[in-house]
Amino acid sequence: KRQHQGRFLDDILNGIYSICEETAWQLPAHNSYIRDTPQLILPDVTRPVMDLFACETGALLACAAYLLEEEFNAVSPFILTCIEDNLKRRILLPYLTAHFWWMGHDDEPMCNWTVWCTQNVLLTTFLMPWSVEMSSRLSSPVRTFCGNAPLFLPENTSDTVVTLQAILHKAAESCDYFLKDYGNDGCCEEGAQYYRHAGLCLYGAMTVLNTVTDCHFDTLFRWDKVKNIASYILNVHVNDKYYFNFADCSPIAGRAGVREYLFGKATGQEDLCLFAAKDFQAGQGQLVTDEVNGGNLFYRMQTVFHYEELMKQDTSGTLSHLSLIHISEPTRPEPIS
């Protein structure tokens, strides 16, 4: 049955205002400003910490504003004002004026935090109403995930365009730092479960960058390293819902779905698309229960927007990924204690 009758709006607004009234958005275990230092006992409200949870909270509010701008304004124009104020103060301003380790610097090793946070900062920025008109005036970055050339700014820009351009530049730079630590084989060092927070978040960040720059980053989806990052999840798949597991990854890493499918399309890999569509159908479309993406609103949006496309895919074909997997017998006669 179709909804959109307004009966959930009060609860949605209560949730939004509860989030906006929180003292801080970061997880207590992440309440520090320097990598691998002790956490502070209480948050400093004048210096927001940008961790995984803060960045994802920003993206959640931006998604809500994107989907329900008209409905919010029908209640009060101050709803969007409240959301915008919180996003500027807790996400955009610290992103542009502070340095957090996951943003990348020199040879410091990066991990999934880099693209996970970067994707959500980009969503926070470009899903909000303030960016709709301005983003069409952005110049494409001179640099393409390499080098240190500055960005050209369009002439006679407003402060908003300059801000968006700075965010675009910094996000592209962080993707550089993430890719420098990834092997050419595309292997996710933390296993199949973290592929969703590493490889797929790289895809998410690249997609936003590509969209707002009129496909400036399109050729990057053809890079061998990026293609290998995309197909990693297929190459470690065993059967049904089981994967080769290592590190702290479970052998049951959750069903593949829309994001894997879209990454496969972007990188031109039919096997990955077939695998994702087949797994999506096996999970009955993941609209009600999504064991991988949980309550992430943006991922749910992607599922809704592409649901029919995946459910209509002919998945009777045979996957060829098993030919890529080589298993060696251990040479050690006894188990390692």
What are these language model-derived features?
Residues 1-137, 145-237:
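Aromatic-lined, polymer-binding surfaces characteristic
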Residues 152-153, 197-324, 328, 333, ...:
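Carbohydrate-active enzyme catalytic cores, enriched for enzymes
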